[in-house]
Amino acid sequence: MVWLVAMTPRQSSLCGLAAHGLWFLGLVLLMDATARPANHSSTRERAANREENEIMPPDHLNGVKLEMDGHLNKDFHQEVFLGKDMDGFDEDSEPRRSRRKLMVIFSKVDVNTDRRISAKEMQHWIMEKTAEHFQEAVKENKLHFRAVDPDGDGHVSWDEYKVKFLASKGHNEREIAEAIKNHEELKVDEETQEVLGNLRDRWYQADNPPADLLLTEDEFLSFLHPEHSRGMLKFMVKEIFRDLDQDGDKQLSLPEFISLPVGTVENQQGQDIDDNWVKDRKKEFEELIDSNHDGIVTMEELENYMDPMNEYNALNEAKQMIAIADENQNHHLEPEEILKYSEFFTGSKLMDYARNVHEEF
């Protein structure tokens, strides 16, 4: 099942927009502070890995709170604020141009043009940006599906996929295809065998009833992007529970959720990382995932939390994002605030001080 997202076009007065735009442009031109772009190497590495293994389900899903391995998505707020414009704020961007882009985004979120962003306005924006990520995934899936469906019959079997997957890992495609055809044992290492087992389970889960072990393009989308299917989202939650639920009671306690990853580095830098890991996950568990605040997270609660098209979650995220930068505590986001906290919203620190802006006004 693929979710279709309908979006209502935004409408506003041309005169109002012109005045509003001039005001923002004036504000941005006042800012000459030196910028320090953030390091986007992790984003680029993920893109490179995706190109190498385009038919392998990604660990990272844009606009989804948790990675497939249960880690928090560190880029989530930037993804749901910038949408397809994330690349426009990379380390090569010119700071002043980036500030202008940020103010253009501000004006789009600020639907009623009162020069401040409310939680409702931010919620609607988050939903739109999430829909953009959905549409991008659908577009990419068409290319990925063609890679595993060379005969173009609109269906891919598990064996066909397995051949393409192993070929992408450096195995001889012809030899693998011949071995599978003759029901011979594949000569792959133990790690690859384990990956294949997990992929097979996921493949069967994506095969909508009546099961025929053949995936259509839509089913293949669910296979690669479980956030597009309610059934696959449930499967993703079960996989995360399998990794985190230490006592097997099908519930997650706070200690289970904040457990440190294996291979902790025993030095000060490693300790700082560990402290941040615990702090971030504890906050996420208590404030967002555990919706009834009983100290336990059920599969249903985790599924609701991970559902990128959950409007209630989007509103909570909107409030949280505003609270990060809301220095005057008016429950709205203002231009000076979003510029001062630009690193949170865009990944780039576009100005070193906001005090000068205030003094100019």
From Swiss-Prot:
Ca(2+) 5 binds at D290, N292, D294, E301. The modification Phosphoserine is found at S98. Ca(2+) 3 binds at D212, E219. GO terms for biological process: cerebellum development; fat cell differentiation; response to ethanol; UV protection. Its main location: Golgi. Residues 308-361 are annotated as: Necessary for intracellular retention in Golgi apparatus lumen. One of its GO terms (molecular function) is calcium ion binding. Ca(2+) 2 binds at D149, D151, D153, H155, E160. Ca(2+) 6 binds at D326, N328, N330, H332, E337. Pfam families: EF-hand_5, EF-hand_7. GO terms for cellular component: Golgi lumen; late endosome. Residues 97-132, 136-171, 196-231, 232-267, 277-312, 313-348 form the EF-hand domain. Keywords: Calcium, Glycoprotein, Golgi apparatus, Metal-binding, Phosphoprotein, Repeat, Signal. InterPro entries: CAB45_EFh, EF-hand-dom_pair, EF_Hand_1_Ca_BS, EF_hand_dom. Ca(2+) 1 binds at D110, N112, D114, R116, E121. Ubiquitous. Glycans are attached at N39. Residues 1-35 form the signal peptide. Ca(2+) 4 binds at D245, D247, D249, Q251, E256. SUPFAM superfamilies: EF-hand. May regulate calcium-dependent activities in the endoplasmic reticulum lumen or post-ER compartment. Binds calcium, probably via its EF-hands. Belongs to the CREC family. This is 45 kDa calcium-binding protein. The lineage of its organism: Eukaryota, Metazoa, Chordata, Craniata, Vertebrata.
